[in-house]
């Protein structure tokens, strides 16, 4: 009887410990999500403090300069209407740092939205790649999945990107789920024909046929996030569009 009583109490303690740990973990996750949203709202307040101010091509907008005072790695701002995607873009010397840090250089599970370290600051490459986590709370790049709904794409065929010097409208021409086995993150191409071949391949991946005309002379932007529904480890959700100067 004593052994059964001991085992029963031990099992109760184990279950209680698991329950408390799970509660702590959920609480920490909620706190981190809230903190992440707060600091992003702080950045947005700086960026939108004078809504009447627009970027004059060739001149860095004052609000963007103010953001760069907070972190010199800020290189632009990305906005997709009717989504949570309205974020500063950062760029480091590698593609690892901002996976795990916010723009205040704090460790953060949500990381930041960031540009591939191989890309130049002012869209001189053929393919500029921007990464972000697919967060369960709907933040960061989670809303890219909205583009799997054709009605959403029809209503939102473009998104906006402001770099340090230029405002861009991005015309979406490809939406697809894939895995890391498909190498869509090439930034530069030796010849125009190589880029044209690449464009043909990504168009074939797309779940929609696009009317956007994109050629080897154009420059594109690629938005990439994890897609666990496609493949838990290697799945990716990708949106690609042609850069057009506003």
UniProtKB/Swiss-Prot annotation:
Effect of gene knockout: No visible phenotype in growth, no change in cell wall-anchoring of InlA, no effect on bacterial growth within host cells nor on virulence in a mouse infection model. Loss of cell wall-anchoring of Hbp2 (SvpA); Hbp2 is still secreted and runs with an apparent lower molecular weight in gels. A double srtA-srtB deletion mutant has no cell wall-anchored proteins. No cell wall anchoring of Hbp1 or Hbp2 (SvpA). Does not impair iron transport. Decreased binding and uptake of hemin at low (0.5 uM and 5 uM) but not high hemin concentrations (at 50 uM no effect is seen).
In Swiss-Prot or TrEMBL terms, this protein is called Sortase B
Q: Does the keyword Transmembrane helix apply?
A: yes
A single Gene Ontology biological process assigned to it is:
cellular response to iron ion
Similarity remark: Belongs to the bacterial sortase family. Class B subfamily.
Q: What is its membrane topology?
A: Single-pass membrane protein
Major location (coarse): membrane
- What is an example of a GO molecular function annotated in this UniProt entry? hydrolase activity
Enzyme class (EC, first level): hydrolase
The regions listed as transmembrane in this protein's record are: 5-24
**Which NCBIfam families does the entry link to?**
sortase_srtB
Record's GO cellular component, any one? plasma membrane
What the entry lists under Pfam families is as follows: Sortase (PF04203)
| Cell compartments where the protein resides | Cell membrane
- Look up the EC number in the record and give it: 3.4.22.-
Mind listing the UniProt keywords for this protein, alphabetically? Cell membrane, Hydrolase, Membrane, Transmembrane, Transmembrane helix
Induction field: Strongly expressed in mid-log phase, cotranscribed with lmo2182 and lmo2180, the sixth gene in a possible lmo2186-lmo2180 operon. Induced under iron-deficient conditions and when fur (lmo1956, AC Q8Y5U9) is deleted. Induced when bacteria are grown in human cell lines. Decreased hemin-binding and hemin uptake by whole bacteria.
**Keyword Glycoprotein part of the UniProt annotation:** no
Q: Which gene encodes it?
A: srtB
Q: What does this protein do?
A: Transpeptidase that anchors surface proteins to the cell wall. Recognizes and modifies its substrate by proteolytic cleavage of a C-terminal sorting signal. Following cleavage, a covalent intermediate is formed via a thioester bond between the sortase and its substrate, which is then transferred and covalently attached to the cell wall. Catalyzes a cell wall sorting reaction in which a surface protein with the consensus sorting signal NP(Q/K)(T/S)(N/G/S)(D/A) is cleaved between the fourth and fifth residues, and the fourth position is linked to the cell wall.
